[in-house]
Amino acid sequence: MAMQYDVKSYHSTVSGVAVGYRTRLKGILISPSTAVTYNTSFCNNVNKSGTYAIAGTTTCTVTIANHGLANGDRVYLDFTSGGSAQDEAYTVANVTTNTFTVTTASLTETGNVTMYPDILVEIDCSNGTAFYTLIPGEGILAKQGIYVGIPNVAITTTLFYG
């Protein structure tokens, strides 16, 4: 296989769409600034919107019509309004056609949420040292682009794609 010359990069300090078209994720550089455990998600850029409610417990009920999930699935949730729920990857439980639950911090709030159900890569880090993750072969296919989910402003990422 010949060397690929059209690899590009995208640097981000906040969550958002990094690439808005079909591409392959080739590698990821993560630079945490503190030694705290973080989870950064790189998702296929397909989402569904809905609402959430947390009633003073650690159970967050998410309502999204025909979400298509099953118990045990991992999703990235971007809490777009309503309070202080943490944007990050969650494991889905108690699935019905239009609702599911995830475990969050104990809060009392409601609001809107955007779900990214197709996580391409999740990377955990627990120290303040930058590191690179090489994606082997041709990379991971992101059919609709790449959404980067950064749970904390103490992390920056650079992704390589093409």
Where are each of the predicted segments found?
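C-terminal interaction-tip segments
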Residues: M1-R22, S33, I150-G162
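Local beta-strand/beta-hairpin segments that build beta-sheet-rich folds
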Residues: D6, T13-G20, N45-V46, P117-C125
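Noncatalytic modules at the cell exterior or secretory-pathway interfaces
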Residues: K26-I28, G139-V153
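Short, surface-exposed beta-strand/strand-loop-strand elements in extracellular ectodomains
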Residues: A35-V46, P117-I123, T157-G162
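Small/polar beta-strand repeat architecture
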Residues: V46-D118
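Exposed aromatic-hydrophobic patches
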Residues: T63, V102, F131-G139
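Short proline/glycine- and polar residue-rich coil/turn motifs
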Residues: N94-V95, D124-F131
